[in-house]
UniProtKB/Swiss-Prot annotation:
Induction note: Expression is up-regulated by exogenous molting hormone (beta-ecdysterone) and down-regulated by exogenous juvenile hormone (JH) III in the silk gland and fat body of the fifth instar larva.
The protein's enzyme class: transferase
Changes seen on gene knockout: RNAi-mediated knockdown of this protein causes significant decrease in transcription levels of pyridoxal 5'-phosphate (PLP)-dependent enzymes phosphoserine aminotransferase (PSAT) and aspartate aminotransferase (glutamic-oxaloacetic transaminase) in silk gland, fat body and midgut of the fifth instar larva.
UniProt binding sites for ATP: 115, 148-151, 184-185, 212-214, 219
Binding site for pyridoxal: 14, 47
Pathway: Cofactor metabolism; pyridoxal 5'-phosphate salvage; pyridoxal 5'-phosphate from pyridoxal: step 1/1; Cofactor metabolism; pyridoxal 5'-phosphate salvage; pyridoxamine 5'-phosphate from pyridoxamine: step 1/1; Cofactor metabolism; pyridoxal 5'-phosphate salvage; pyridoxine 5'-phosphate from pyridoxine: step 1/1
Organism: Bombyx mori
Recorded consequence of changing residue 230 to E: Loss of catalytic activity. Misfolding of the protein
Protein name stated in the entry: Pyridoxal kinase
Swiss-Prot/TrEMBL GO biological process terms: pyridoxal 5'-phosphate salvage
Function: Catalyzes the phosphorylation of the dietary vitamin B6 vitamers pyridoxal (PL), pyridoxine (PN) and pyridoxamine (PM) to form pyridoxal 5'-phosphate (PLP), pyridoxine 5'-phosphate (PNP) and pyridoxamine 5'-phosphate (PMP), respectively. PLP is the active form of vitamin B6, and acts as a cofactor for over 140 different enzymatic reactions.
Length: 298
């Protein structure tokens, strides 16, 4: 049992030496918001994969099992939350499913937040064999699921061309056993805004997310971590958690874009200038100012 009431998270996802994706995007905000975070890195790369040269290595299953075994043997395997993101192999996802069940033996009330990282904008960047493992093994174990539009469509097999399609996708995910479904970003035809959606207990909320004309990496990882945090801190008030998450994310993205554009007035901005400015926005993470309100749609 934990020695105090501090929430404790085990986060299993990617790691980069430079920049902010995976655990580098998730751990700092969670710590700033008062969570103890232990992290296991499914990959360790020098940078994220939008850079020209990729160096690093992948954690294999035996190594992951050994790390978890050490936590168990030393009796430091009590967690309130479990967060997963990018993983490159179906076997590693199956191992993660075993870890979830193991952690729930220690804490039956463990909250599992699953970010089913598979791709974006119609393109997969993990092996196709990962999809059925997410769909059939991990998603049914999740308390909170935070896919983007493409990932939600892959998992359910339902296209999402409008709000009705999005609601069908959400209901299908609920039917698969997920208590809280959060679509981190959907493009439903609005030229100016993406739409964020959150649904739990028969209530669904939507919130506009103004588009920023640049490509950022690590925003989904940050979204999942923030939603985990604010769900806990608001007593599972999904509307407020969504508003706080979007307020934080949008402030960081806009600040990152404006800073990058100041040194690149025209053309595409190189990846090293669009790394999320998390440290510079520590106060935003601690106390986000809500400017965009979520609206109940059913």
């Amino acid at each position: 049992m934990s020695q105090d009431d501090t929430p404790r998270v085990l986060s299993i996802q990617s790691h980069v030496v430079h920049g902010y994706v995976g655990n580098k995007s998730a751990v700092f905000p969670l710590q700033v918001l008062g969570f103890e975070v232990d992290s296991i890195n499914t990959v360790q790369f020098s940078t994220h994969t939008a850079y020209k040269h990729i160096k690093g290595y992948v954690l294999n299953n035996d190594q992951m099992k050994e790390l978890v075994e050490g936590l168990v043997l030393n009796e430091v395997d009590y967690y309130t939350h479990f967060l997963t993101g990018y993983s490159r192999s179906p076997d590693s996802l199956r191992e993660i499913a075993k870890i979830i069940k193991q952690l729930r033996e220690k804490n039956p009330n463990l909250i599992y937040v699953c970010d089913p990282v598979m791709g974006d904008n119609g393109k997969m960047y993990v092996p196709e064999e990962i999809l059925p493992v997410y769909r059939d093994v991990l998603v049914p174990l999740a308390d909170i699921l935070t896919p983007n539009q493409f990932e939600a469509e892959l998992i359910t097999g339902i296209p999402m061309k409008d709000l009705d399609g999005a609601l069908r996708v959400i209901q299908r995910l609920h039917d698969m056993g997920v208590k809280t479904v959060v679509l981190s970003s959907t493009d439903l035809g609005d030229e100016e805004n993406m739409i964020g959606l959150a649904s739990t207990g028969g209530s669904c909320y939507k919130i506009p997310i103004p588009k920023v004309e640049a490509t950022f990496t690590g925003t989904g990882d940050l979204f999942a971590a923030l939603f985990l945090a604010w769900s806990h801190l608001t007593g599972n008030d999904v509307k407020l958690a969504l508003e706080k998450t979007i307020a934080t994310l949008q402030s960081i993205v806009v600040d990152t874009y404006q800073t990058a554009r100041a040194s690149h007035l025209t053309g595409k901005i190189p990846p090293r200038f669009t790394e999320l400015r998390l440290v510079q926005n520590k106060t935003v993470i601690e106390d986000p100012k809500i400017k965009l309100k979520a609206v109940k749609i059913n």
